[in-house]
Amino acid sequence: MIRIAKESDLPAVAAVYEAILDHEDATGLHYTGWKRGAYPTADTARNIFNAGTLYVGVDEDGTVWGSMNLNGIQLPECKNGGWSIPAEDSQVAVIHTLTIHPDRAGQGLARQMVAFAEDTARSQGKTVMRFDTGVSNAVSNHLSPAIGYRFAGTVDTFFMGYVHCPLNLYEKKL
């Protein structure tokens, strides 16, 4: 099940962030561009929760297996990217920090999260879904076209002001 997060989910969301960073360290594949202690953190989860835009994927027993931030905020670098689907800011939904616990990878959960985000955005009157992902994030860059997203270009950014991170942009008409 995917639902809006509860405050009691926050430690589990932060634990998924850490599990992803641990997995990257263990495999040597640092595909997210994240930096431990800087982004994402428990404070990141709390801030997204406080904004009312944190969603979680949970098992029947309440175990959190993933999360995402779904809002309409585009990074300044991304806002003027190579978008081909015209839309006013109020018509755009954006997925940020979509996470799946590494132990649950390959089960179609990211697809479920994106489908949920699309349905939620449509119910809010949004007409376009956009998101960015690091150019080195092979999983996200492979999944995006497979679920109907169009590559809209690459932008250069210093993500969270700490790391050079070129981002691939994706969009889909809802």
Model-derived features: where do they sit?
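A short beta-loop-alpha structural element at the N-terminal edge
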Residues: M1-A15
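Conserved acetyl-CoA-binding loop-helix of GNAT-fold acetyltransferases
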Residues: I100, G106-D119, H142, A146
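Conserved acyl-donor/pantetheine-binding loop and adjacent beta-alpha core of acyl/acetyltransferases
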Residues: N69-T97, A105, F158-G161
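Conserved GNAT acetyl-CoA-binding A-motif
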Residues: V114, A121-T133
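Conserved beta-hairpin
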Residues: A51-M68
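Conserved active-site alpha-helix within GNAT-family acetyltransferase domains
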Residues: R111, S123, S136-G153
